[in-house]
Amino acid sequence: MKIKDAKKPSFPWFGMDIGGTLVKLSYFEPIDITAEEEQEEVESLKSIRKYLTSNVAYGSTGIRDVHLELKDLTLFGRRGNLHFIRFPTQDLPTFIQMGRDKNFSTLHTVLCATGGGAYKFEKDFRTIGNLHLHKLDELDCLVKGLLYIDSVSFNGQAECYYFANASEPERCQKMPFNLDDPYPLLVVNIGSGVSILAVHSKDNYKRVTGTSLGGGTFLGLCSLLTGCESFEEALEMASKGDSTQADKLVRDIYGGDYERFGLPGWAVASSFGNMIYKEKRESVSKEDLARATLVTITNNIGSIARMCAVNEKINRVVFVGNFLRVNTLSMKLLAYALDYWSKGQLKALFLEHEGYFGAVGALLGLPNFS
């Protein structure tokens, strides 16, 4: 499509975040197309738009998260809807082939991408799809995408939320949180691994630390221990398990609380510590192992996040990333852990578009390359 204003990039508008496990895609669907533009629009562009917006599933693994669609927003001076699509990184060659089949390269479009896969698969985009990637730093994209999504209305809903009464499971409930004044903020991005950023303004942020023990670790260990085939299956098993069957607690060692150092009896003293005993190994279920794996990974992330928040003197910690997708269990664990161990000084925050900020940040980079 020819746009009269040369400052605007040509359609279609995409942003990609190619992670170690998932590819996240943000796609802007214009809804203010003029009669002249529609007449000039080439068939391949119509085909791409129709394919992406009329389906909620693509092949056997691609998913459009319809509930996250942002309706009627303005981007680069155009009105449209912002769609969010994800699929496993291992299926990326199929996506590239689809782009080739739909003559994507004839549109002379700019494809902005971030994440490690933007480097790893750059040659595949060029050789299979005749497409050229413009690579963007993933932490820059994460921060820019997060701040942008938080600044636009989520169709009248709150983007940011927390769990009230996190220490009381029966009273714990999701509540909206006003993030209009977001700084300073500690951002904990949980993907295959974990990166932690201290954000002091839209242009002032740094990576504080990270850990290799993230969502990929949870799924990898769960697959080994239980034979599960997917993230969703691993979470389903974890929701039915009891981690204390595998973990050794403070009370297992002290017979109760360790009062001198303020350690309650229910706290985990040793993750999977009970698995050194033959009778415990024989009685533990796959669901228990899945739950213990989830608790181990989540507690570790929460502990590191808390230490970073204290060191950086930041009391709001926002957790993002696809590890938290459909994973209320971990969100509540993080909320509880931060609230308890900080004696109420730290608040765990979450965002509805948890895993898509990198893709949105890449999309926002389009005008720089058009």
Swiss-Prot record:
MF (Gene Ontology): acetyl-CoA binding; ATP binding; pantothenate kinase activity; protein homodimerization activity; vitamin binding
UniProt superkingdom: Eukaryota
The keyword Acyltransferase appears for this protein: no
Enzyme class: transferase
Cross-referenced Pfam families: Fumble
Catalytic activity entry: (R)-pantothenate + ATP = (R)-4'-phosphopantothenate + ADP + H(+)
Major site of localization recorded for this protein: cytoplasm
Function comment: Catalyzes the phosphorylation of pantothenate to generate 4'-phosphopantothenate in the first and rate-determining step of coenzyme A (CoA) synthesis.
Protein name: Pantothenate kinase 3
